[in-house]
Amino acid sequence: MHSKHPTDTARRCETGTDSSDTAADDYSLAGYRFELPEEQIAQHPPEHRGASRLFVMDRKSGVNTQASFKDIGSFLPEGALLVANNSRVLPARMLGRRPTGGKVEFLLLTPLPLVQPQTGTDGRSCAEAEGLLRASKRVRPGDVMHFDGLDVEVLHTADFGRCAVRMHWKGDLAGLFLRQGHLPLPPYIRRPDGEDDHSRYQTVYSRQDRLGSVAAPTAGLHFTPELTASLQEQGFGWAEVTLYVGYGTFSPVRAEDIRTHTMHREYMEITEQAAQAINDAKRQGRPVVTVGTTSTRVLEGAWAACGEIRPFTGWTDIFIYPGYRFNVADHIITNFHLPESSLLMMISAFAGREKTLQAYSQAVAAGYRFFSYGDAMLIL
């Protein structure tokens, strides 16, 4: 099945939800706050890829174990299938000038494969897209921003700098961003992107034909080619899905009752090969281990839309919070997430909010590094 309309995917987590055992605090935004020293927010990747710590949380036994990520194979259930997100981060942030000379930043939010170029009257390519504009003065419809090789015309404006725009350029758009663009590092990384980020803020299995995410699926950053090969030699399966990570992944939940939060949507794909691998694992009783919240969102979003895992292309805006019953993911590999974030709420739905926050407290006390370039967690 190929779904092309956002209504074909589940909007929220009501499908499969059972709130009878959910505490009131699970729905309160205040229930997702925790203290984190500033120095434990990782500003750089570890010196060597994969040299991360691993916090293993066993939901059944209640025992938490501290380990190294390179040893993750010794904790994974026998015969498990790992499902990873193979999308690649686009250097989607452009720096330029307004006609008046003022500085402006543009971040392309529309996944690159969904940009549909046409030929304009001036012979250049043009396409409408969604973006984020930051400028010293308010931008208005009709304004045109100039970047190196790219003109951006504002069509409509929305909250928090989001805009509908028409882009004008010559040649290959992907090549233009790859040459001139900057990686949109998360806002809590307080430095400009550097040369090292262009390799380290990508997973080793990301694909050039899946270029278009504005953030990395960070649980995958810990994997090296050697570790991936070793896991497959140990009998673990490997499948890949695609979710173009949107900037909404950094947006905090603002609603005091999280059930009223409007979740951002993201574009995803499950190939026939991946669907077959996942269904085979389920049929054979082999656990499915999702590599990150993005892979988890793909599988649970597809299940919410179709009632099964099958080839799928389309949008998901599923919001997973406590009370949700997981249908596909049996275990999750993930990083440590921001307070009050939808990602922390998803992990709390999987492992329990109080137990998750207790684990986070232990990780803080043990000096774990947090967020995108930080350490990892395996939830069994």
Swiss-Prot record:
Belongs to the QueA family. It comes from the Bacteria. Keywords: Cytoplasm, Queuosine biosynthesis, S-adenosyl-L-methionine, Transferase. Pathway: tRNA modification; tRNA-queuosine biosynthesis. This is S-adenosylmethionine:tRNA ribosyltransferase-isomerase. It is an enzyme of class 2 (transferase). GO terms for cellular component: cytoplasm. The keyword Transport does not apply.
